[in-house]
UniProtKB/Swiss-Prot annotation:
Cellular component annotations (GO), alphabetically ordered: cytoplasm; nucleus
Cofactor comment: Binds 1 Fe(2+) ion per subunit.
Biased composition (Low complexity): 14-30
Name of protein: Alpha-ketoglutarate-dependent dioxygenase alkB
């Protein structure tokens, strides 16, 4: 879940308004917030964007970030000696024989082709190196933008403005219009103009394109209630069958079955996004893992401990990678320190894709965006909509 990180180097200072008596005015300073080890590591990947005089530093002149401490499951030999000691090859532990994957699927590769790693000191943590082809990744990206962000699911925009239907489809129309205008080919009679969206009070909102750029998260299944931090049967929407099948197959292959995804958060990161160290502990069922799947740009993910006072392990998560946080890691702080600059997976770009898919990939690439889908079982005994797939299907 999201958490806002306050800058502990910034203190609130209250002074008298009477400048003439400033020498005798009482000044109070609130205690500086402790910089935890989690925050210290997170800040290693924070780029300085302003000079001492407050002016913006051009991107090309900024001090580059040192990514050498980041563990990389994709390039094992490029890791530091310290990080190499943390990597456990768990590929042989993947279950491929206890049941038959009898039918081919358009959504993922067969588990016998998966490469799976663990992390020393974190039993129950698994990293699956992307088990998707580029076309399979784009099917999930399409779902995330078209289906998962639309009503009846909640997102950060509809939470305040009410349901907004067809956010992507209308945003895409405006994106096409912008492109045609830039090429001098725009003709209002030929291009369908989406009606300006209205909020729940009937007041006009920004354009769909502007709203789309503000999209940060959406929720599936049980709609997480952010303020009280709970799930309620009162707020439930049907969980997508294909996503349910995918995460259950992942759970079976990594011996976390039976597993029923009852809720998911879909996060939409842009190049400047981070996520502070947090726990996912609102679920009644904590023995089942969080299954997290990412597409688009590369992130520096921080796998922490049960307290923020222990330094987390930074690791790269690339497009298509899956992280499974079970066992000890289910109870540990974690977050996203950085979306790596210019890291969008260029393998997702294909001139043979249809125009709609091209625009989705273009939208992700233009702001170095990342889509993350993370699922969890909420109750010890699955309730509304909870169902197990047939292992032998």
């Amino acid at each position: 879940m999201y958490e806002t990180e306050e800058d502990p180097t910034t203190s609130n200072v209250a002074t008298t308004n009477n400048e003439k008596t400033a020498s005798t005015a009482a000044t109070t300073t609130e205690p500086v917030k402790k910089v935890t080890e989690f925050m210290r590591v997170q800040r290693l990947f924070r780029q300085v964007t302003k000079s001492a005089n407050g002016k913006n530093i051009p991107k090309e002149k900024r001090e580059p970030i040192d990514y050498s401490p980041v563990l990389d499951f994709h390039n094992l030999e490029n890791n530091t000696e310290e990080n190499k000691k943390l990597i456990i090859d768990c590929t042989s532990n993947v279950t491929t024989h206890d049941f038959e994957f009898n039918r081919d699927t358009e959504f993922y590769l067969h588990p016998r082709e998966w490469k799976v790693y663990g992390l020393q000191g974190y039993p129950g943590f698994y990293f699956i190196k992307s088990p998707f082809t580029a076309s399979q990744q784009k099917k999930w990206i399409k779902h995330a933008l078209e289906d998962y962000a639309d009503p009846p699911n909640n997102n950060n925009i509809t939470l305040f403005h009410g349901p907004i239907k067809n956010l992507w489809k209308n945003g895409e129309k405006e994106l096409i219009n912008e492109e045609l205008k830039s090429q001098g080919k725009h003709d209002d009679d030929e291009i369908e103009q989406p009606t300006r969206p209205l909020d729940k009070n009937g007041e006009p909102l920004p354009t769909y394109r502007q709203l789309l750029d503000k999209l940060a998260w959406s929720t599936l299944g049980y709609q997480y209630q952010w303020t009280p931090r709970l799930y309620s049967e009162e707020f439930y929407e049907e969980f997508p069958d294909d996503l349910q099948e995918l995460v259950q197959k992942i759970a079976i292959a990594t011996k976390f079955d039976p597993y029923v995804a009852e809720a998911a958060t879909v996060n939409f990161y842009s190049e400047d996004s981070i996520m502070g160290g947090h726990l996912d502990d609102a679920e009644q069922e904590m023995e089942k893992p969080i299954i997290s799947i990412s597409f688009g740009s590369t992130a520096v993910f921080l796998m922490g401990a049960e307290t923020r006072d222990i330094a987390p392990v930074p690791l790269f998560i690339r497009s298509g990678d899956i992280v499974i946080m079970g066992g000890r890691s289910r109870y540990c702080y974690h977050g996203v320190a950085k979306i790596v600059e210019n890291s969008f997976d260029l393998g997702l770009i294909d001139e043979n894709d249809d125009q709609d898919l091209k625009y989705k990939i273009q939208w992700l690439k233009e702001k170095n965006r990342r889509v993350n889908i993370n699922t969890r079982q909420v109750f010890k005994v699955p309730k509304l909509g909870g169902k197990l797939i047939n292992k032998n299907e």
